Amino acid sequence: MKEFKAVFPKALIIFMIFTILCGGIYTIFITGISQLIFPKQANGSIIEVNGKKYGSVLLAQQYNDEKHLWGRIMNIDTDTFVDDNGKKLAYSAPSNLSPASKEYEALVKERVDKIKANHPEQDDKAIPVDLVTCSGSGLDPHISVAAAKYQVNRIAKNNNMKIKDVEKIIDKYTSGKLFGVLGEKTVNVLEVNLAIDGILK
């Protein structure tokens, strides 16, 4: 008991010091630095035009009409959780289906058929895999350059645009490899679609 009484005050002081340092000072310092150096990224990389917010470049938005660029399959559940007022809450997660299962095979086939039906000009050209599969998060905001270029003709036709103009928009919102060597080039779906709509210039 004596040992406890001797150690406890010291442990409590250390606990309080590190709580203040790590929970308070460190948090305030990092928040302040991030707001000073890169405020847009620190606040969620929100796209805002003329005072209206259209979404974050870091989160996918659902587009499935013929005029817009389609992103990866979004895996969102709106049936499991509700808030205190009974309003449905959306959350995303990867699918638990086995790639070898019949259910997954049928699901991918359904997606492939939809892609082919909406892109008849591509004939038997291989469909980029990211157009028929989910990402790990279920909310991936990017697709591959190949997946974006696959949709160019449909987008141009349904927006009365020239193919080269659609390609220019895609090129504008294509990010290069990290440090020039890591990963692959990716296209931000939301930015492309806002540019197609004339919101982003």
Swiss-Prot record:
Gene (name only): kdpC
Record-given protein name: Potassium-transporting ATPase KdpC subunit
Function per UniProt: Part of the high-affinity ATP-driven potassium transport (or Kdp) system, which catalyzes the hydrolysis of ATP coupled with the electrogenic transport of potassium into the cytoplasm. This subunit acts as a catalytic chaperone that increases the ATP-binding affinity of the ATP-hydrolyzing subunit KdpB by the formation of a transient KdpB/KdpC/ATP ternary complex.
Transmembrane intervals: 13-33
Annotated GO MF terms: ATP binding; P-type potassium transmembrane transporter activity
Domain of life: Bacteria
Organism: Clostridium botulinum (strain Eklund 17B / Type B)
Stored Pfam families: KdpC
Topology relative to the membrane: Single-pass membrane protein
Cellular compartment(s): Cell membrane
Lineage of the organism: Bacteria, Bacillati, Bacillota, Clostridia, Eubacteriales
Signal peptide boundaries: none
InterPro entries documented for this protein: KdpC (IPR003820)
